[in-house]
Regions:
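Short cysteine-rich clusters marking metal-coordination/redox-active sites
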Residues: 70-73, 85-88
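Short metal-coordination and nucleic-acid-contact micro-motifs, chiefly zinc-binding Cys/His arrays
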Residues: 63-67, 81-84, 99
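Long, charged N-terminal interaction/targeting segments
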Residues: 1-55
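Residues at or immediately flanking beta-strands
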Residues: 22-27, 58-60, 85, 100
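A short Gly-Trp-Pro
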Residues: 34, 38-61, 72, 95-101, ...
């Protein structure tokens, strides 16, 4: 479960940046094609945050859809599955977004 290591890194990054202030909320953006399971990150967050400035903070996750351009026909397509096909039947998609994993917002007091 790589989400544990990812969540540890998120907590560590936020804790370094807040300068000892208490964090009340963290908003993450996770692309549907990132390979990161949002529910697993939620499960790990409280464990990783324990004993840090993030202890007790609320975690909000915004899931981002994927988009790509078909290399065969040039059509833009929504891509929420790594095995998605274009309407023309081609699997040769240039994924433009949906692979993101970023900290969008941090609220501190």
């Amino acid at each position: 479960m790589h989400e544990l290591a990812i969540t540890e890194s998120i907590v560590s990054t936020v804790a370094e940046r807040v300068g000892g202030r208490r964090v009340t909320r963290v908003v993450l953006e996770i692309g549907r094609l990132s390979g990161v399971v949002p529910d697993a990150v939620r499960f790990c967050f409280d464990l990783c945050a324990e004993g840090t400035e993030l202890a007790g903070a609320r975690l909000d996750i915004v899931q981002l859809s994927g988009h790509g351009r078909c290399r065969a026909c040039g059509e833009l397509a929504d891509v929420d599955d790594p095995l998605a096909l274009c309407a023309c039947g081609s699997a040769d998609l240039d994924v433009r977004d949906g692979q993101e994993l970023r900290i969008r917002e941090v609220e501190v007091v």
